[in-house]
A protein has these predicted regions:
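Active-site nucleotide/adenylate-binding loops and adjacent lid/helix of ATP-dependent enzymes
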Residues: 2-9, 19, 60-61, 85-89, ...
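Conserved N-proximal alpha/beta basic substrate-recognition cap immediately N-terminal to
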Residues: 11-121
Length: 171
């Protein structure tokens, strides 16, 4: 199999700094990289694993590896494409399980804590939110994160109880 990998990335991120840097580093290792929008991939399941990938409607050989870079925009369809590569035995850098794990911020913290890594005190809040309870267990200032979001979206700093209460009123 030739030294070729695919970076799965949506068109709008093809020219991003991160994508360009990854491509440069792969090229330094003499690895040919193809940027592929995962939404341009069609898959079908067969027992031979041959020609079960189409890109823009054309049969395609499987790459040597796949590097998903789809972030919080990873849909069920994109995860199905990633799982298809896994089933075919194609190494996937950032497996479908890893993608599921990082999409859930609380679960990510639980995994890190289980691995004895230092993490900030973290709690899942339910409504109605008891500000005294938060103050007793976390304190202020506190970082407040929404359940989903990436690239810094959905992350807020509440330096005081008052700011925390204001954040809650916006939710």
């Amino acid at each position: 199999m030739e030294n070729k990998g695919w970076i799965l990335v949506k068109d709008k991120f093809w020219d991003s700094y991160e994508t360009n840097r990854l491509t440069e580093e792969f090229q330094k290792q003499d690895i040919e990289i193809q940027l592929v929008n995962p939404n341009d991939i069609d898959i079908f399941v067969n027992k031979e694993n041959k020609s079960s990938i189409l890109v823009n409607g054309e049969p395609s050989d499987a790459p040597r590896f796949v590097f998903p870079r789809t972030g919080s925009g990873t849909t069920y369809y994109i995860k199905a494409v990633i799982r298809h590569f896994e089933r075919m035995g194609v190494p996937v850098i950032n497996s479908s399980d890893a993608i599921d794990n990082v999409k859930d911020k609380l679960y990510s913290h639980q995994i890190l804590a289980q691995s004895n890594l230092d993490i900030p005190n973290t709690m899942l809040l339910k409504h109605p939110i008891d500000i005294d309870f938060v103050n007793d267990y976390i304190g202020f200032p506190a970082i407040v994160k929404t359940i989903s979001g990436s690239y810094g979206r959905g992350v807020f700093l509440a330096e005081t109880r008052k700011q925390f209460k204001q954040l809650l009123s916006m939710a």
